[in-house]
């Protein structure tokens, strides 16, 4: 009846997948010099390659903490490593809003938003009053654990459209220091 009255389907709930198909993990592992990770609709990082782990420390985080928004807004150690933190954080928040539109009533996403409002004054302020930003998914610059600045461009690949899984691959703006393995 609601479809007849409103002429639109109800908002969908996002299913927060926590694993990737084995071939996707293999693809990321093959990107030996490119940090890459897969995130679900809620921006939980659910898979990553070794170089992404070296850069972001995903394997050292509890599953609950392995969320890009939570890492950017509520992890002071990562915040210190992001030279353009304010710009990156606003960009990430704007892109999350786009994903939220896919499942605006999803309880897991709404809980994350409420948690971040408590954990971060910046998140709380920007959530109330969104700022227009340009399109760029991911973090532009980060200091590695030896304080060396790394600058990136990104590409987002849809891994599974129905499961809302996206792979973010980072590409160095300068020539990589490592060599490509022989095949």
Where are these regions (language model features)?
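Short, surface-exposed beta-edge/turn micro-motifs
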Residues: 33-34, 165
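PAS-family sensory domains
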Residues: 32, 39-125, 129-135, 142-143, ...
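Short amphipathic alpha-helical segments
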Residues: 17-29
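Short amphipathic recognition helices of helix-turn-helix/homeodomain-type DNA-binding modules
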Residues: 1-18
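Low-complexity, glycine/alanine/valine/leucine- and proline-rich hydrophobic stretches
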Residues: 133-183
């Amino acid at each position: 009846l609601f479809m007849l009255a409103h002429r639109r389907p109800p908002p969908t709930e996002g299913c927060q997948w926590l694993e990737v198909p084995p071939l996707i993990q293999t693809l990321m592992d093959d990107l030996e010099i490119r940090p890459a990770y897969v995130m679900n609709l809620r921006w939980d990082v659910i898979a990553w390659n070794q170089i992404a782990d070296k850069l972001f420390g995903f394997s050292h985080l509890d599953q609950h903490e392995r969320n890009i928004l939570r890492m950017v807004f509520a992890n002071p150690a990562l915040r210190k490593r992001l030279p353009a933190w304010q710009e990156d954080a606003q960009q990430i928040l704007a892109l999350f809003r786009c994903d939220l539109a896919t499942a605006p009533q999803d309880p897991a996403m709404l809980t994350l938003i409420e948690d971040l409002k408590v954990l971060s004054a910046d998140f709380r302020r920007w959530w109330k009053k969104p700022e227009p930003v340009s399109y760029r998914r991911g973090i532009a610059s980060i200091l590695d654990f030896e304080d060396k600045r790394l600058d990136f461009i990104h590409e987002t690949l849809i891994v599974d459209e129905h499961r809302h899984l996206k792979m973010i691959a980072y590409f160095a703006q300068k020539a990589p220091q490592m060599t490509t393995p022989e095949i």
